[in-house]
């Protein structure tokens, strides 16, 4: 099979990369009714599989789970989760032939095997759903022409999808129809009903494409969402300890610092995050972020180039066939780092202390968010998509680090995201070491003293922060998410 994106001509590539439309709430007036009375079979019962299924059932849909025979016979975790929540569970052969919509929510590396198994069992005119388009775009999976192929991609981990639904809300969601597989023209109706059944329509839905979702998703998770947080954690911890900070305190400042900082980001964008600093600290954070952007821009661009060309995907799929040798090696090495093995700090760190003593971390967040956004937009991805795949998801990933450090982040994210994270962080850490060596007192671990500030300089910096394109689009999109709960647990 050929990478689907690479089979398109340039005009088609640009059209699909640039497909992004914020959908009005009136477009979801019918809710999930298009799928009511139809059989929805979910393949896979992980975080997305279980939680989307719970939401869809609560929205009145007929949901069951198709699992492999051995998973049922051995009563594996997927079988236990589905049965304990009262769902009907059966083998592929028992459930797929009756399904009107088959939703594939297994890990990326399993998609080809799953799709090749279920396709012959699917009835004529059925639909196949994904929550990530990697199998279609990067693997180039060929789907039977009578089958409608759609995507509903919540921009949150599965647990958040469920929690927000239970609160009567939802999470921002991308939906798409594969242009090669919409024989009856019903793909958008199916995708809208599925999104409504998960609650996504209450938080904002973008009509996108499989291509735009995959390319932007890969870029975000490799760079700012996971790679930058991992590289920043390792660099900042080592710097603090090198300068005499208690390793336990240093570990807590970083582990909970990302979450505390990005909670401000979630509520009011980069502007609010920077406003949490004193004026001297804000000016210093801005200067550091500009330096970081200049240093890291080529690395961000390389990741985007490799994602667009398919180089990243081919390398990762080669590792799949080699029993994940690179992935497992990188995972083991990360677990042995000084940050991951540092003792826990039993004392309390006040919320403002995370800002005052984390100026460099704030600069890293600002630089990483803006670089990821700018690089995606420069590659033809629309600003709304770039926002969701950079700034919006960052607090959610930071929250995983607050739970169990980098280990938890890498467990929660997909293997695809984890592989890309390691590629980025392994390149970024040595790239930034000379920069780290030139830091000044107050950049990390100590507060910058109050002092005189040049009014004109402060005015210009404030204007530069507020006028960035991500702040403009973010203000609009956050207007649809004002009811989302705070997630920070730092203390």
UniProtKB/Swiss-Prot annotation:
Q: So where does NADP(+) get bound? A: 45-48, 68, 76, 78, 108-110, 158
What Pfam families does this protein's entry cite?
A: KARI_C, KARI_N
Domain KARI C-terminal knotted spans what residues? 209-344, 345-484
Q: Which UniProt keywords apply?
A: Amino-acid biosynthesis, Branched-chain amino acid biosynthesis, Magnesium, Metal-binding, NADP, Oxidoreductase, Repeat
Q: Which GO terms describe its cellular component?
A: cytosol
An example of a GO molecular function for this protein is: ketol-acid reductoisomerase activity
According to UniProt, this protein's pathway is: Amino-acid biosynthesis; L-isoleucine biosynthesis; L-isoleucine from 2-oxobutanoate: step 2/4; Amino-acid biosynthesis; L-valine biosynthesis; L-valine from pyruvate: step 2/4
Cofactor(s) needed: Mg(2+)
Q: Where does substrate bind?
A: 414
Q: GO biological process annotations for this chain's record?
A: isoleucine biosynthetic process; L-valine biosynthetic process
Which InterPro entries would you find in this protein's record? 6-PGluconate_DH-like_C_sf (IPR008927), 6PGD_dom2 (IPR013328), KARI (IPR013023), KARI_C (IPR000506), KARI_N (IPR013116), NAD(P)-bd_dom_sf (IPR036291)
- The record places domain KARI N-terminal Rossmann at 15-208
Q: Where does Mg(2+) 1 bind?
A: 217, 221
Documented EC number(s): 1.1.1.86
Q: Quote the record's cofactor note.
A: Binds 2 magnesium ions per subunit.
Q: Which enzyme class, named as a word? A: oxidoreductase
Keyword RNA-binding tagged: no
Q: List positions binding Mg(2+) 2.
A: 217, 389, 393
Is Nucleotide-binding given among the entry's keywords?
A: no
Q: What does this protein do?
A: Involved in the biosynthesis of branched-chain amino acids (BCAA). Catalyzes an alkyl-migration followed by a ketol-acid reduction of (S)-2-acetolactate (S2AL) to yield (R)-2,3-dihydroxy-isovalerate. In the isomerase reaction, S2AL is rearranged via a Mg-dependent methyl migration to produce 3-hydroxy-3-methyl-2-ketobutyrate (HMKB). In the reductase reaction, this 2-ketoacid undergoes a metal-dependent reduction by NADPH to yield (R)-2,3-dihydroxy-isovalerate.
User: Which family does the record assign?
Assistant: Belongs to the ketol-acid reductoisomerase family.
What the entry lists under NCBIfam families is as follows: ilvC, PRK05225.1
**The protein's name in its UniProt record:** Ketol-acid reductoisomerase (NADP(+))
Annotated organism of origin? Escherichia coli (strain 55989 / EAEC)
Q: What is the primary gene name for this protein?
A: ilvC
């Amino acid at each position: 099979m050929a990478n689907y994106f690479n089979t398109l001509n340039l005009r088609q590539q640009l059209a699909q990369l640039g497909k992004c439309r914020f959908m009005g709430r009136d477009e979801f007036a019918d809710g999930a009714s298009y799928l009511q009375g139809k059989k929805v079979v979910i393949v896979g019962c992980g975080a997305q599989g279980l939680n989307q299924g719970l939401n869809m059932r609560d929205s009145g849909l007929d949901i069951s789970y198709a699992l492999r025979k051995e998973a049922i016979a051995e009563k594996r975790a997927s079988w236990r989760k589905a049965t304990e929540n009262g769902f009907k569970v059966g083998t592929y052969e028992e459930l797929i032939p009756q399904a009107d919509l088959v939703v594939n929510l297994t890990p990326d590396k399993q998609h080809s095997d799953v799709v090749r198994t279920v396709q012959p069992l699917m009835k004529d005119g059925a639909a196949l759903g994904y929550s990530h388009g990697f199998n279609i775009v990067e693997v180039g999976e060929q789907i039977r022409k009578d089958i409608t192929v759609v995507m509903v991609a919540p921009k949150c981990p599965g647990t958040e999808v469920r929690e927000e639904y239970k609160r009567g809300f939802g999470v921002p969601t991308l939906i798409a129809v594969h242009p090669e597989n919409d024989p009856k023209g019903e793909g958008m109706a199916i995708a809208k009903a599925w999104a409504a059944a998960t609650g996504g329509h209450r938080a904002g839905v973008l009509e996108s494409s499989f291509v735009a979702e995959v390319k932007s998703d890969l870029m975000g998770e490799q760079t700012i969402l996971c790679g930058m947080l991992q590289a920043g954690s390792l660099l900042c911890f080592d710097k603090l300890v090198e300068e005499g900070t208690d390793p336990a305190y240093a570990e807590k400042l970083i582990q909970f610092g990302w979450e505390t900082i990005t909670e401000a980001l979630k509520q009011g964008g980069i502007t609010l995050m920077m406003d949490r600093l004193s004026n001297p600290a804000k000016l210093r954070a801005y200067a550091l972020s500009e330096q970081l952007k200049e240093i890291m821009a080529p690395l961000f661009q390389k990741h985007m180039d490799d994602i667009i060309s398919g180089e990243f995907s081919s390398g990762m799929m080669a590792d799949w066939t080699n029993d994940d040798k690179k992935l497992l090696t990188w995972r083991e090495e990360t677990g042995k780092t000084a940050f991951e093995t540092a003792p826990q700090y039993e004392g309390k760190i006040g919320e403002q202390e995370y800002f005052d003593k984390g100026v460099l971390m704030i600069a890293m967040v600002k630089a990483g968010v803006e670089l990821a956004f700018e690089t995606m937009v420069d590659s033809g991805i629309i600003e709304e998509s770039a926002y969701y795949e950079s700034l919006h998801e960052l607090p959610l990933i930071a929250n995983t680090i607050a739970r169990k450090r980098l280990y938890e982040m890498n467990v929660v994210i997909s293997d695809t995201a984890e592989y890309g994270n390691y590629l980025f962080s392994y390149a970024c850490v040595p790239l930034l070491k000379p920069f780290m060596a030139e830091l000044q007192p107050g950049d990390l671990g100590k507060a910058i003293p109050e002092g005189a500030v040049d009014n004109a300089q402060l005015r210009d910096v404030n204007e530069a922060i507020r006028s960035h394109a991500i702040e403009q689009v973010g203000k609009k999109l956050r207007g649809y998410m004002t009811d989302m709960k705070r997630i920070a647990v730092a203390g």
